[in-house]
Amino acid sequence: MTSTTSPIEVQAHLHHQYFLGLQLMVSVEEGKEVVGEWMFRLFRRQHEEKFLSSVGKLGLDDLPHAVACAKYHVLSNGVGGVRVEYMEETDTKAWVRFRYPRWMYDGPAICGIPVEASRGFMKGWYAQNGVSLKNPRLGFVCVSEDLTVQFGFCGYFKEYDHDLAPEERLQFAPD
């Protein structure tokens, strides 16, 4: 924080640090599975409240679903100052990559947050995009997770040629 930091930026920073502290506390006191379930519920609720209306507000309604989802994360995170990159491979496959240092787990907190927390929020948000868009063929494939000491959080939205079972909506393919 600098002397030119606005009060709203200070408040946002404090809330973010509190959120990180809560994740650490819950994982230590209650266990990594509990923090994962908590993150799932938190992000699922936010997704249900914000995703569809925001897709419209951001002008993404008419795009292919995989592309719209990737662009959504770039635009919605960018509003809050979170750096996300996007690449459209095809109409049915679009990539997102969160730039380092990753805002979600900044500083040394990344060393104490269990991977279940990250997977909980991916399951609560990324895996639900197809459900919300009423597209049962849309899923998210995570190719890298910063909490597993890979190169950061990166993956792609993909529209398959078949309906996905709930457990297929979020996949991990680090190789």
Q: What are these regions, as identified by a protein language model?
A:
Residues 1-95, 102-121, 131-175:
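N-terminal accessory segment detector
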